[in-house]
């Protein structure tokens, strides 16, 4: 007899967006898990992958935009790179407070930007960033697999300088896709992500990926596949 299927991360029609900003940011005592509204937002086992994303976003130096702060895993790695400025968008009150405290300790200038990216990104100037790292949590069942495309299409391409690098992830989506539809992570990315990148204006020969081996803990609710994929998307 097979084990019962795990409860999906989102129920049909579920929308966390109205309550997300003010909801408590539940960092556990060991600072290895962050939950908001009961959703598994981030876990420290992701560290090697977050560091790969950070390295990609900071690879051109200069001014880096990070969308979503979480547990500061990627942000701390970005600060180790020879960058000039580090702009960070975060909407949750508790996470933003942690961002403000963290910013005071960093070697490079941090510009904390409070709000949903949908509110903040339109206020940012064109061709302003050398690198972008987008890693926010989906706030509804409707946008579970697609929220990153809205940012990429509406903002990422225009915000990057020519030669700038976009990297991003949606582990909550990709974990589900690798569980239910795909066995090869590169194929998953090619079929579900590349079309949206092309639509946003990026060229196919400027879209690369790197795959790393990383085995999640057995109790991780959102990701079980033993590989992770890092997009490296350059604006021409």
From Swiss-Prot:
CDD domains, sorted: AdoMet_MTases (cd02440)
Modified residues (N-acetylserine): 2
GO terms under cellular component: cytoplasm; nucleus
GO-annotated biological processes: animal organ morphogenesis; creatine biosynthetic process; methylation; regulation of multicellular organism growth; spermatogenesis
UniProt KW S-adenosyl-L-methionine keyword: yes
Ranges in coiled-coil conformation: none
Binding site for S-adenosyl-L-methionine: 20, 50, 69-74, 90-92, 117-118, 135
Record-annotated RMT2 domain positions: 13-236
Reaction catalyzed: guanidinoacetate + S-adenosyl-L-methionine = creatine + S-adenosyl-L-homocysteine + H(+)
SUPFAM superfamilies: S-adenosyl-L-methionine-dependent methyltransferases
Pathway participation: Amine and polyamine biosynthesis; creatine biosynthesis; creatine from L-arginine and glycine: step 2/2
Enzyme class, broadest EC rank: transferase
Binding site for guanidinoacetate: 42, 46, 135, 171-172
Key words, A-Z: Acetylation, Methyltransferase, S-adenosyl-L-methionine, Transferase
GO MF term list: guanidinoacetate N-methyltransferase activity
Function statement: Converts guanidinoacetate to creatine, using S-adenosylmethionine as the methyl donor. Important in nervous system development.
Similarity comment: family membership: Belongs to the class I-like SAM-binding methyltransferase superfamily. RMT2 methyltransferase family.
Subunit structure: Monomer.
Name by which UniProt lists this protein: Guanidinoacetate N-methyltransferase
Gene this protein is translated from: GAMT
